[in-house]
Swiss-Prot record:
One of its GO terms (cellular component) is small ribosomal subunit. This is Small ribosomal subunit protein uS10. Pfam families: Ribosomal_S10. HAMAP family: Ribosomal_uS10. Keywords: Ribonucleoprotein, Ribosomal protein. Part of the 30S ribosomal subunit. It comes from Methanococcus aeolicus (strain ATCC BAA-1280 / DSM 17508 / OCM 812 / Nankai-3). Belongs to the universal ribosomal protein uS10 family. Coiled coil: none annotated. PROSITE patterns: RIBOSOMAL_S10 (PS00361). GO terms for molecular function: structural constituent of ribosome; tRNA binding.
Amino acid sequence: MQKARIKLSSTSYQELDGVCNNIKTIAEKTGVDMAGPIPLPTKTLKVTTRKSTDGEGSSSFDRWTMRVHKRVIDIEADERTMKHIMKIRIPEAVQIEIELRS
């Protein structure tokens, strides 16, 4: 039986958990084995910029951060289950990658 590894990433953990719950309910309804969603470490991207563009005045900085949340789901890849997973509405903020394995 083939297995599918579904990798999900997003900057919004609420939308990410919503998609994970949809995949989980599909797996329960079709009766296939599923492992996950396994949370991976959150990546924090930081950018610090100077507020003053000309270099004059006091040194004040803006600090910007973006957090990227990731989840991994391993699921048995039978045709019916994969067809249902492909029909899920995925928000724009969520990136999905499906990898099939033997």
